[in-house]
C-alpha cells in the first residue's frame, strides 16, 4: 500500500443560520459533520453523493478555502488546518484544485497565458525552466491544446477546452494532490470522456493523487481506485472501487447503484431497483442516530437512537468500511453468461447478429437496413426528416426532387 499523503480527521463544517434584525444565530447547517479518510500517493479517491450532501464543501475544506469548524487536515505529516499564512503558501504548491464550472472559474478579461501562468506570479520563487511563457505553452500542449493559442481569451474556447485550461493551471506547479470538484458535470458526455481520459493520462505521467468529487457514478467508477459515499454530511461507505460497486454494504449505496441504467437488456430484469421513500432531511436539522434511517427499509429502533460508526465489515474484502448497524453485501446486478439463452422476443426483430456476422462475413448494409426497417445516418444526415417525407402527405415538407 502506498504511503498516505493526505489525511482528513473528523472534519466538521457548520454554517450558522442568522435571523432577526440583530442577526443572532438561530441554528447551524451541518454541511460536513465528522468525515475521515486517507489519500495515498498516486491514487484516485472518488467522493459521490446526492446534491447537498457536503461533497464540494469537503473539497474546499481540504484546500482550506473554508476554515473547518473542527477536525484536521494532515498533509505530508503537517497539520494543514493550523498552518500560518506563509506555511500555507508553501504547502499550496503541492495541493491544487480544479473547479466545477469552466465558464466562471476563468477570468474573462485575462488571456489563457496569464491564467495558466498566474501561479508563477503568486509563487515568485518558483522559476520555470526556460521561462514562464515557455512553461505555459508546454502546459497547453500537455492538456491537448494548441500552444499558439496562448494569447486567446476564455470566451474563444469551448467548455471542454476551458476545463483543460483549468487543469493546466492546476498542474502548473507540479502538485502532488489535485482536488477535482465535479470537473466534468458541466460538460457534454463525449467531452466528459475526453477530460477524464486526459486526467488519467496526467496521473500516469506526473504521479498525481486525485480527490475526485462527482455525482455521476459511472464516471467515478471509471477513474477511481477507492470510492467514498456521502450522505447528509457524513461518510456512509468507503472502500475499494470493485467492492463498493459490486458488493455495496450500506443501504444508501445499494439504492444509488440500483438506479444506474443497465445497458444490456437481457440483464435489466435480473435487478430489483430500490426506490427510496421521502425526501432528504435538512442538514440544518438532521435525524437522530443514523441519518439515513428515515428513508431506509432496514431501519429499526436502534437506528434512530445510536449513530453507527464507519467500521470495517468482516465479510468485505480489503478496507471496506460501512456506517450501518445492519450492513450486509448485496449484489445489485449479477453478471451472467447469456450466450446460450434465447434472445428476448422484444428485440428479435432488430437483432442483426446472424450467423454471417458471427463468422466475420462481408456485411450487406442494404440487407441490414431492409431487415431492421430503420434508417441510419451520422449527425447532419437527418434520417428523421426522410421518414417524415415518406409518412406525411405532400405539403410543406415535399421533397425538392425524387
What are these regions (language model features)?
Residues 63:
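Helix-to-loop junction immediately C-terminal to a conserved catalytic motif
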Residues 79, 130-148, 257-258:
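Conserved ABC ATPase "signature" region
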Residues 153-157, 161:
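Conserved ABC ATPase signature
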Residues 2-4, 17-23, 28, 240-353:
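Short catalytic/signature loops enriched in Gly
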Residues 21-26, 80-96, 114, 122, ...:
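ABC ATPase NBD coupling module
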Residues 176-179, 183-187, 191-269:
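P-loop NTP-binding/switch modules centered on Walker-like glycine-rich loops
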Residues 71-79:
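Conserved ABC transporter NBD signature motif
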